[in-house]
Amino acid sequence: MNESKRENIQVINIGDCRAVLCKNGLAIPLNKDHKPIWPDEKRRIDRVNEKYETNEKIHFDAGDWRIGDLSVSRSFGDLDNTPYVTHVPDLFDYQLQSDDEFIIMACDGVWDVLENHEAINFVRDHRNDNHTEFYSIPGKYPNREAFESDNISRKLASYAIARGSTDNVSVIIIFFSKE
């Protein structure tokens, strides 16, 4: 990345999908999960709850605070749990630096079984297997298809399942070119 031309990225999230940046080997979260137990979200829910006489939608179940049957405090389409669950996303800005290597974007099926640094280390350990990094750079190998075994996102998803994830698992990895 050209130091004189730094670029900004914006991460918009809702729910418990997470974007984690690898910066020179360190895991840097680029957003936060929307869980009812987190202080900011709890305050927002408490303010809403003051307007209503009952809070039977908010309860502790299966090791998580839940709103209705959801373990998140923000989501799209869950109108049954309005106004406690909001559809307003958070926006996070980040200025890319030359030591930024890649971003992992994944759903909670990954983050429930892997810590941020574990996922970052997994990708760093496997990024050179069959040149998987280059499949994410448009035009780098225009005449070669990425085989399933070469796909590092698939490898990370499979690793999360092997670690015991029982939730849905989806992963996107964006590598930054040093060119």
Curated annotation (Swiss-Prot):
It is found in: Virion. The lineage of its organism: Viruses, Varidnaviria, Bamfordvirae, Nucleocytoviricota, Megaviricetes. This is PP2C-like domain-containing protein R307. Keywords: Virion. The keyword Amino-acid biosynthesis does not apply. GO terms for cellular component: virion component. It comes from the Viruses. CDD domains: PP2Cc. It comes from Acanthamoeba polyphaga mimivirus. Its main location: virion. Signal peptide: none annotated. GO terms for molecular function: protein serine/threonine phosphatase activity. The keyword Transit peptide does not apply. Transmembrane segments: none annotated. Residues 1-176 form the PPM-type phosphatase domain. InterPro entries: PP2C, PPM-type-like_dom_sf, PPM-type_phosphatase-like_dom.
